[in-house]
Structures are given as C-alpha cells and as structure tokens.
Amino acid sequence: VEQPRTALAERIAEQRAGVGDPRALIGEMRRSVLLVPSIDGRLWSAHSGGVRWVCAFTDETALARFALHHGPGDRPMDYAALLGARIVDEVVPGLGEPAGLAVDIASEGGSMFFPPITGIVPDGVAVDADAVEEGRGRGR
C-alpha cells in the first residue's frame, strides 16, 4: 500500500508538471518537516556544480529509497526531522560555502532542488545577492 504524498511532494509534482506556483512551492518547503539523513551526527550532503546540497526527504518512504543505495547497510539510517525553514535559514548559512536544499533525490521524477539564491536562502549567503542588489539600485 503506497502512502499518500505529502503537501510538499504534491507541490513538487505540480511544479515539475509546469502548473505549480513557485512561491507556493517555496512556502510549502519552508513549512514542511523534512527528514535529513545523518552519519555520526552530521547531516548528509553532497557536492554538485560548485554547490553543497543538503539532502532531505518528504517522508520515510522517500528516505528509504535513498537509504537502499547510500545507507549503512545492516542497520537503519539515522536522520533528523527538521523544518525546511530551519534547513535553509540556519543549516545552509552555517556550512560556509554556497549551499542549497535537495529534496527527494532518490524519487524518480519527484526531486526538487532549492538553490542558494535570494528568496530561498538568506541574502547573506545567496549567490545572486549582489546581482539582485544591483538590479534594485537601478530602479527596477
């Protein structure tokens, strides 16, 4: 029996289908409790494209798909349950490098990346913060 998708998984599906509202997606991500795998007390992340991605999952089923390939094998994968807002507002800035949030990366056709840009992460760690400020300075 397949469990129903979370509200965030629904927003991701809408966005991937081209019918979602990006602001609603970001809002849902911020309100959602996400499961972040941990190893030795450190949150799981991966580097790709010059960005460190904190990997998080919308539910235990999505986390289990990931654990099949990346888990410790003979024992359950530890994880932390964190609000999306806490991940992008506190965890990401604490990494000290460009970082974003990758959700449900083991779900075929169901993943979503929240890059380190203004409107997702705090301006102080957003990679586009200077460009946004320049745009505002010209009366846009």
Predicted regions and their residues:
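An interfacial alpha-helical scaffold signature
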Residues: V1-R140
